[in-house]
UniProtKB/Swiss-Prot annotation:
This is NADH-quinone oxidoreductase subunit I 2. Keywords: 4Fe-4S, Cell inner membrane, Cell membrane, Iron, Iron-sulfur, Membrane, Metal-binding, NAD, Quinone, Repeat, Translocase, Ubiquinone. Its cofactor is [4Fe-4S] cluster. The gene is nuoI2. Binds 2 [4Fe-4S] clusters per subunit. The lineage of its organism: Bacteria, Pseudomonadati, Thermodesulfobacteriota, Desulfuromonadia, Geobacterales. It comes from Geobacter sulfurreducens (strain ATCC 51573 / DSM 12127 / PCA).
Amino acid sequence: MPILTDFKAIATGLFVTWKHIFRRPVTVEYPEVKRTPAPRYRARIVLTRDPDGGERCVACYLCSAACPVDCISMEAAEGEEGRRYARWFRINFSRCIFCGLCAEACPTLAIQMTPDYEICERDIMELVYEKEDLLIDGCGKDAGYNFYRHAGIGVAQPRGAGECEEEPVDVRGLMP
């Protein structure tokens, strides 16, 4: 009986091999043929600007606190008009796992993920990107958003006076 079970195991293995031998290969010749990522693919991190051209990052440290591998570091500074900004901002892409938690934690939408997945360097120190390397000229996905224009609107205005906010309904006036 053990000979029959061995023969059956060999026949099953050969059947699986012959079944796959005539299929097309799934290997992609990467440098020559580049795959297009999915529409919602997240890869390289960039820092975006406001519509008026200023930096969006206010150095609140929420991105570095949300990062599970601690690859984001920065130093906060304050401008002449009292506006906070990041004096230096650094991301170590050799440690980054591209989870996107930093982009979700950013209250100013300064950190955004792009589908650029080609981050290859021979020296590991070249994977440490400074603020100048990360800043892009555009606003990214949220072109009309300006943190300082939207921050504190609900505090200074009565209910119903904010952007895209309806007037409150007086519930007592609806009663008979």
